Amino acid sequence: MKLINKLLIILLGCSSCDPNTHEFGFEVYNQSDREIDVCLNMWYLGIQDTLVPAYQDYDATSQYNYGFTTVEKKSVNLFIVPGSITAEEIFRMANDTIRIFIFDTDTLAKYSWEEISRNYNILQRYDLTLKDMKLLKHDIYYPPTPATRNIKMWPPYNEKVSITNKTLN
């Protein structure tokens, strides 16, 4: 009887949840040998094509940096935009394209945001449409995989770029 009561309470609790509440998110697969930080930028798109998001408040000593998700080397983590918003709404607000920036966590800890922005010290940037996200099944990989070769990105697929005496990718 106690088991039945517990099950009823659980079922009632689940049924009272708002079915129209959505969160937009994607899984980030870090297949590299370094820890990375992932940042979604959808509000700055109209300003400059290659703009690094202006997160002046990034604090490398804090585990809580709004807008950033850390992904350990050789692991996967979920990036979620909180709130009741659909993917379609996110892309509509972002003029149909979002940018996902991938940074080396050590770079974020070592350099000021001004230096990172000025030197464009990113590992990867994906410029994604909703169609791209659906094609990728909301999975983002670093480094890029063959599935992303036709996606707009910088540096381009399979291209190595040297920044501040360091070869990326």
Residue ranges: model-predicted function:
Residues 1-17:
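Sec-dependent bacterial lipoprotein signal peptides
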Residues 17-25, 39-169:
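Intrinsically disordered, low-complexity segments enriched in small/polar residues
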